[in-house]
């Protein structure tokens, strides 16, 4: 028996060690993952890096369940985290960055919001109602005890005065309905207090503009995210454009290079030059669906993000030749998103995923679909 117990004890200790090691390993991986999210951004010096990370930790992700911008892996937290890092790199103070974030999302984004009377009222109102309920219950119980004493004294006096009967004294029978009615009254009071305790704070909370502020900030982040997806860094594009131009000088009849040059011009907001490049590609290889879709995108942004007749015509031609044309579906999803047609935008993005086209940036599409889901839940009145 002793040997069996020893074996069991050693086995239990070994299991504990294994669990501890696995926990430590997972914790180490989590730290590494968190550090990796920070290290991908190159700061000018270590002090800026430390300040940026601490500042990002003090800001709440608008989309997550009580996670800061460093802890969260959501797309909006990633974008906000990079925005904080860039503003720190530009030399902006912590207060300037916090003011910009709160102006967009409200005080919800700040883990340490400034004191405001409406916030204090929101937190103190349930406490005040609890205290009020406790006071009312205390006086109600005291009144009940006093009434019971009076009734008991009255019954005692009546028993002394009146003769006992076979069925008991009549005063005791008269006292019972009174107790039942008082019990019903007390139950109603408790129910009313409990209802008020829940209804008043909830009504006041939903009367605040916190959710609408967060939703507006989320919408602005969606628009900014779309622009970041469409437009890359200007200086980087200048180098790409120069390389492509040199390549075309040696081989001007390469349609694929003309397409790449057009995309680089679009990313650099040079839409006129992009349309010239797409036109040259079309002359060399014909009116292919991808060329038409890229040209429609350039025309759309050239017109100030307006759906002109020419843009619509090019989109229809591209999708008639290839219903899963990537640039056309991406543009239609962007237009639907800007018009707050989230369900329609989601359908276009899902079509991109289902197309199986290798040119589709699946990670970017999935991130946009998650944002669409968040916005749809927001329009339905659900808490972000």
Curated annotation (Swiss-Prot):
* Name by which UniProt lists this protein: Formate-dependent nitrite reductase complex bifunctional subunit NrfFG
**Domain of life per record:** Bacteria
Where is this gene product found? Periplasm
Q: Which residues bind heme?
A: 61, 64
State the Gene Ontology terms under molecular function. Answer: metal ion binding
- Supply the alphabetized keyword list: Heme, Iron, Metal-binding, Periplasm, Repeat, Signal, TPR repeat
One annotated Gene Ontology cellular component of this protein: plasma membrane
Q: Could you tell me which residues belong to the region NrfG?
A: 180-384
Q: Which PROSITE patterns does UniProt cross-reference here?
A: TPR, TPR_REGION
Instruction: Supply the InterPro entries for this chain.
Output: C-type_cytochrome_biogenesis, CcmH/CycL/Ccl2/NrfF_N, CcmH/CycL/NrfF/Ccl2_sf, For-dep_Cytc_NO2Rdtase_NrfF, TPR-like_helical_dom_sf, TPR_CcmH_CycH, TPR_rpt
Which positions does the entry assign to TPR repeats? 221-254, 255-288
NCBIfam families documented for this protein: cyt_nit_nrfF (TIGR03147)
């Amino acid at each position: 028996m002793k040997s069996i117990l020893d074996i069991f004890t050693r086995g239990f200790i070994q299991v504990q060690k294994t669990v501890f090691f696995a926990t430590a390993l997972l914790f180490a991986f989590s730290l590494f993952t968190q550090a990796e999210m920070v290290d991908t951004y190159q700061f000018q010096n270590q002090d800026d890096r430390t300040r940026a990370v601490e500042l990002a930790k003090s800001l709440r992700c608008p989309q997550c369940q009580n996670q800061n911008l460093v802890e969260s892996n959501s797309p909006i937290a990633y974008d906000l985290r990079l925005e904080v890092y860039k503003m720190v790199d530009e030399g902006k103070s912590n207060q300037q960055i916090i003011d910009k974030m709160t102006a967009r999302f409200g005080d919800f984004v700040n883990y340490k919001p400034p004191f405001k009377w409406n916030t204090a009222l929101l937190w103190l109102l349930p406490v005040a109602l609890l205290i009020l309920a406790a006071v009312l219950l205390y006086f109600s119980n005291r009144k009940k005890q006093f009434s019971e004493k009076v009734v008991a004294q009255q019954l005692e006096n009546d028993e002394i005065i009146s003769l006992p009967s076979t069925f008991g004294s009549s005063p005791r029978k008269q006292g019972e309905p009174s107790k039942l009615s008082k019990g019903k009254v007390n139950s109603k009071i408790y129910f009313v207090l409990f209802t008020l305790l829940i209804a008043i704070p909830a009504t006041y909370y939903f009367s605040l503009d916190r959710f609408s502020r967060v939703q507006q900030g989320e919408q602005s982040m969606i628009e900014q995210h779309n622009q970041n997806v469409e437009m890359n860094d200007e200086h980087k594009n200048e180098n790409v454009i120069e390389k492509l131009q040199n390549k075309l000088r040696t081989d001007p009849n390469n349609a694929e290079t003309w397409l790449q040059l057009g995309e680089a011009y679009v990313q650099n907001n040079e839409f006129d030059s992009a349309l010239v490049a797409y036109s040259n590609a079309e002359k060399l290889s014909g009116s292919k669906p991808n060329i038409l879709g890229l040209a429609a995108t350039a025309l759309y942004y050239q017109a100030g993000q307006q759906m002109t007749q020419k843009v619509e015509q090019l989109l229809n031609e591209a999708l008639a030749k290839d219903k899963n044309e990537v640039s056309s579906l991406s543009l239609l999803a962007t237009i639907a998103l800007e018009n707050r047609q989230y369900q329609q935008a989601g359908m276009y993005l899902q079509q991109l995923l289902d197309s199986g086209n290798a040119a589709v940036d699946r990670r970017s599409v999935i991130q946009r679909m998650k944002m669409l889901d968040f916005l749809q839940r927001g329009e339905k009145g659900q808490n972000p």
